A protein has these predicted regions:
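FAD-site-proximal beta/loop scaffold in flavoenzymes
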Residues: 29
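AMP-binding/adenylate-forming catalytic core of the ANL superfamily
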Residues: 8-9, 13-14, 36-123, 140, ...
Length: 160
């Protein structure tokens, strides 16, 4: 898995009046999409997640979509989002925000235990907040920066 890069005559030449964004996204005429993906054995490209959303915990790369899919397989969870939050030992750790089905009760320990049955333990949330709404943009994408901001305000996100 790696960051998807494209080069073509029909790829944008740059962002209008955004020199810093251009320097980050376009290198030697290659456009770095910001998406992490991979090719399968048949040559099909699969987009897995956004590189900037990747959580780095103890040197391990954790993609939020994988953790969210594991959480969403729980019968009592109707929506979930995860972000990386500061951790003195690991750099970042996974924090989950979960919406439960109406009338359902689960503890933080229940959700963490369930996730350990679904994915590798280093990818599992170390804390869970039960919330009523997950912030999304008009196209339905999770606004991770809104969820992440309160935890990084004092520190500044020190991992890429």
């Amino acid at each position: 898995m790696g960051e998807i890069q494209i080069k073509s005559d029909v790829v944008l030449k740059g962002y209008w009046k955004r020199d810093e964004a251009n320097a980050e996204s376009i290198v030697d005429e290659w456009f770095y999409t910001g998406d992490a993906g991979f090719f399968d054995e048949d040559g099909f490209l699969f987009i897995h997640d956004r590189v900037k959303d990747m959580i780095i915990s103890g040197g391990e790369n954790i993609y939020p979509a994988e953790v969210e899919n594991a959480l969403m397989s729980h019968p009592d969870i109707i929506d979930a989002a995860v972000v990386g939050v500061p951790d003195d030992k690991w750099g970042e750790t996974v924090k989950a925000f979960v919406i439960l089905s109406e009338g359902k009760i689960q503890s933080e320990a229940d959700i963490i235990s369930y996730s350990k049955e679904q994915i590798a333990s280093y990818k599992c949330p170390t804390s869970v907040d039960f919330i009523n709404d997950i912030p999304r943009n008009p196209s339905g994408k999770i606004l991770r920066r809104v969820l992440r901001e309160p935890f990084w305000e004092e520190k500044g996100r020190n991992v890429s």
